[in-house]
From Swiss-Prot:
Belongs to the heat shock protein 70 family. HAMAP family: HscA. PANTHER family: HEAT SHOCK PROTEIN 70KDA (PTHR19375). It comes from Xenorhabdus nematophila (strain ATCC 19061 / DSM 3370 / CCUG 14189 / LMG 1036 / NCIMB 9965 / AN6). Keywords: ATP-binding, Chaperone, Nucleotide-binding. Gene3D superfamilies: 1.20.1270.10, 3.30.420.40, Actin, Chain A, domain 4 (3.90.640.10), Substrate Binding Domain Of DNAk, Chain A, domain 1 (2.60.34.10). One of its GO terms (molecular function) is ATP-dependent protein folding chaperone. InterPro entries: ATPase_NBD, Heat_shock_70_CS, HscA_NBD, HSP70_C_sf, HSP70_peptide-bd_sf, Hsp_70_fam, ISC_FeS_clus_asmbl_HscA. Chaperone involved in the maturation of iron-sulfur cluster-containing proteins. Has a low intrinsic ATPase activity which is markedly stimulated by HscB. Involved in the maturation of IscU. This is Chaperone protein HscA.
Amino acid sequence: MALLQISEPGLSAAPHQRRLAAGIDLGTTHSLVAVVRSGQTETLADSENRHLLPSVVQYRKEDIQVGWQARQQAASDPVNTVSSVKRMMGRSLADIQKRYPNLPYQFQASENGLPLINTAAGLVDPIQVSSDILKSLAQRAEKTLDGKLDGVVITVPAYFDDAQRQGTKDAARLAGLHVLRLLNEPTAAAIAYGLDSGQEGVIAVYDLGGGTFDVSILRLSRGVFEVLATGGDTALGGDDFDLLLANWIREQAGISDNDHRLQRQLLDIATQTKIVLSEADSAEICFADWQGRITRNEFNELITSLVKRTLLSCRRALKDAGVTADEVLQVVMVGGSTRVPLVRNMVGEFFDREPLTSIDPDRVVAIGAAIQADILVGNKPDSEMLLLDVIPLSLGLETMGGLVEKVIPRNTTIPVARAQEFTTFKDGQSAMSIHVVQGERELVNDCRSLARFTLRGIPPLAAGGAHIRVTFQVDADGLLSVSALEKSTGIESSIQVKPSYGLSDEEIARMLKDSMTNAQEDIQVRKLAEQKVEAARVLESLTGALEKDADLLSQEEQVAIDAAVQALIESVQGTSPDAIESAIKQLDKQTQEFAARRMDTSIRRALAGHSVDEI
């Protein structure tokens, strides 16, 4: 399926004019930029032939340092040197301080509770820090290509939520970059590996970077690239390996001081030791007045529990995809942390096959992003690649009784648009509150609230008379827009969902587990709630009818209806949906004659004063 060559606003669609595009891997620990030149994809190096750019920014009064220079100052100036900023993207200050209590920065909260870091250069937020990293990479690309970039594809973890993705886009715009698309990191890696070889089948992409872990189960078939399921953890990566090793060194050396500068030095030594242990069976450690040695087996014991956590995510993703480990043809290893021998061994044992590591795991994501950028900017209009990503949790609306009506089920491929029609519950209702939720449970209270907005100006008709069409639209970057349209008047209201802080992979996993654990109970709870809503509707409708036409009933009929009403009210107080349903049917039976008389009376009133010819 070929992509249509439609020029972006401001870009020429002239044939033979090659446009400059780049793929950027905006990583937690390191970032890279890659391009396609003369048909070959390559990552770009700096003047000292270093391809990786540390995702570190130092803010000084006189200037800003990005990358290697900033990293060198991290130990001596930790307060003004921001690293692993990706972990802060889209999160509230309270969430960050709870997750990472030992960060050395001087934080203060913005008006909406987001983090601001007080530096020598003033207050900066995660978007500004990310923007400075992107700016540095863009300058490297433009210098190498000798021209201005027409567009970039930036990669993000598969489990980044709307706020985190929007923050990444905002950082790119702040850096003066035109974002062609945000691309999931595992998806980018699969482009670099799977599509080039043309292999069809199921592939697992295991991406363990510095700060995040993602696993994607993909299917490649006849040029169609589909993500079957995703999983992972936005707060687990090689940085955690370093932290465990740094704590081990601290214990062995008998260090009790919690000085931030000392902690940074310990982390630097731990990182270097981890790298040595990827090649050697043991490593010598020198810190202050202490000297020691750690073996690879000792290091493995420290990190085994973390690696097992990643494999649990793999197991869940396989289950979501409806495939077994035996059906996986290849396992793609992504991220610098996959160089750790224990990681490769445990992943190989889990999938029962040797993982693919032929492309540098640090560069493979940037390479895939560059390939995609080259296509999206219009340099490969004949490309047969079709890319489909998925949403991690179902999206829906709250309906009467606190129930959830799912509009887009989880693991639906994106971009996607789905619509459903709803109606009013009460007579004369002129407004409707739209509550957007995310999750797999049947009740709103058990799901995550995303946004609320109100559609006003609905014609005040009888209950059920107005028809409101609610449309959910998720774009290629995973951002959700919800609109509500009253069909008779054309009145519309909409909202773009941008949560103020992120949803961790652990929370997603918990929500999925809870939905499975409580599935039977949820069905019963939903059935009970639905019957209670129906009972309320019936009672409200009957109350209105009696207020207008009670004179149509005999005393005996009134007593019988009152008894049926009381029985229904009592059943609603209970927990049996069947009892409520039975009481509704009994009330309906008692009021059938009343309804027929009301209909006859309405017809007579309508015909009064009119001749047969007029009718």
